[in-house]
Each structure stands twice: as C-alpha cells, then as structure tokens.
C-alpha cells in the first residue's frame, strides 16, 4: 500500500489506478472544479499521510498541478510521459499502462523549498535540450528518465533545480538519451 494519497483529475484516472492493481487511496479533483470539500479532503490527506499529485501530461493537468503545489508545497509529484499516456486519440493518465504509472509513482519527487541552482540554460543548450530542432523530443526523453515530466526549456530547468535532480542522475539520463 502506498503511504501517500494519490491526487488524480477524474473518475477514469481513479479507475485506471484500481485496474492496475495499485494499492493506494485516491482523491480526484474532477478537473479544475476543485470544490471546498475536495480541497479539504486533499488538505487532510496532505497533513496526515502526504499526497502524490498525478495529473494528465497536458496543459490542464499542469494548471491543476501548479494550483495544488501552491496550496500544498510539500506534495510529491509523479509524471507519466505524454507518449506513454496516449491511446485511442486521447491523452491522460487513464490511457497509461501499469508500468508507466508504477514508474511515475516510484520516481515521485518533492519540490524543495530551497531549490538548488545546479543546472543552467547552458546545460540544456550544450546537450541539445534547447535551441535545436529536436530539443523538445530530447527534453521529453530526459524528463521521463528523471521522473520530472516534460516542459519547455524554462520549465524544464525549473524542474531540474526544483526537484533536486543530481548531476549523476542528469549524466545517466543523458547517457541513455545518447545511447538510444
């Protein structure tokens, strides 16, 4: 049983977690329709057990994640890569397979109050993650390897520093990128 409560967007996401036989309690936000009783349930879970935010890898999911992060700064974050959350012309956690969801939960990270400033835009540029025609795909791959999700260059840099990614993790992800 996962200690933290998993916060998902909708009923289909909850059903997917159950269908994958992941032993965890969930709370759904019903999209961005966060009613007071839902926020109170999330707050109670956050204070008692901790929460893992697992939203869809799309714009709406990122807005919900940001809103919840502002309210619950010590929440953990799990990211399923976009390419692993697409099926039947639909994008969402409910489309992801069990392995993708488990990997995202295993790699869940907490934002740090004192973000490190280990990485700069130069690191991204030197490794083809910014300013190249395939930078977006490269960031997507590295983000999936690191468990921090996809973002544009500026967002990606914030995640690298904010989620405490180490140089060793960075180097291993780049090595995997360059091998593939």
Predicted segment positions?
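Short, ordered loop/turn segments at secondary-structure junctions
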Residues: 29-32, 56-58, 80-85
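Phosphate- and divalent-cation-binding pockets in alpha/beta enzyme and binding domains
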Residues: 16, 63-67
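C-terminal, charge/polar-rich interaction regions
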Residues: 103, 110-180
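Acidic beta-strand-to-loop metal/phosphate-binding motif
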Residues: 7-9, 46-60, 79
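Catalytic phosphate/metal-binding cores of nucleic-acid and nucleotide-processing enzymes, i.e., regions
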Residues: 1
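Acidic, glycine-rich catalytic loops of TOPRIM or P-loop NTPase phosphate-binding modules used
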Residues: 4-6, 11-15, 19-48
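Long, charge-dense
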Residues: 67-114
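Charged, alpha-helix-enriched surfaces in structured cytosolic catalytic cores
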Residues: 59, 63, 96-100, 133, ...
């Amino acid at each position: 049983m996962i200690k933290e409560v998993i916060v998902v967007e909708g009923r289909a996401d909850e059903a997917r977690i159950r269908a994958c036989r992941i032993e965890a309690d969930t709370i759904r936000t019903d999209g961005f329709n966060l009613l007071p009783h839902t926020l109170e349930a999330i707050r109670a879970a956050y204070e008692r057990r901790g929460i893992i935010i697992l939203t869809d890898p799309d714009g709406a999911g990122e807005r919900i994640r940001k809103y919840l992060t502002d309210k619950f700064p010590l929440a953990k974050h799990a990211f399923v890569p976009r390419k692993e959350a697409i099926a039947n012309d639909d994008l969402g956690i409910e489309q992801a397979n069990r392995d993708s969801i488990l990997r995202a939960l295993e790699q869940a990270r907490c934002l740090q109050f004192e973000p490190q400033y280990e990485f700069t835009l130069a690191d991204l540029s030197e490794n083809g993650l910014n300013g190249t025609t395939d930078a977006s795909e490269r960031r997507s791959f590295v983000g999936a390897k690191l468990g921090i999700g996809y973002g544009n260059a500026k967002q990606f840099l914030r995640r690298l520093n904010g989620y405490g990614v180490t140089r060793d993790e960075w180097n291993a992800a780049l090595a995997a990128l360059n091998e593939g």
